[in-house]
């Protein structure tokens, strides 16, 4: 296992100690990305994942029969490519999950640019045995159109979230929220 190593780009920048289970073994972690016909934006996402501060993870791409060069992009970065028969995001994720044996799975989209410490900041929460899931908002970058920023105001609150194109990291720390 290990972070992505894109061809010709060197090693992932990760130097963070892997998250360990009680037996001292590292958790088997994956980032799962469903996609269909979005190779160029997927290339951007995988490029960012290749530079994560936490590098002990695998990337799984669940591809719903793309007709573009998605598989080539996956090969470029060493991501595992799964051809799935579905035509929607939920089914693509579920199809891939049934084929995976990872203990922690992080989800993102093929048009979301994760911050360079995204994996590290999500994985660290699982050091607490009471944490079962982690999530957060997906903010539009500063240079996105005004309409995307309006969507942030409407959807990216602590009450509900909805992804906007090319999410960027908000300022501040993740905040644990508990539910009964």
Where are these regions (language model features)?
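N-proximal low-complexity "stem/linker" segments adjacent to membrane-targeting elements
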Residues: 2-48
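Acidic helix N-cap motif at the loop->helix transition within catalytic regions
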Residues: 40-43, 68-75, 117
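Short, acidic, metal-binding catalytic loop of nucleotide-sugar glycosyltransferases
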Residues: 47-56
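A conserved acidic beta->alpha catalytic loop
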Residues: 48, 63-71, 112
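Short aromatic/hydrophobic "clamp" motif used to bind/position activated sugar donors
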Residues: 105
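A recurrent flexible, glycine/aromatic-enriched loop bordering the glycosyltransferase active site
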Residues: 140, 161-180
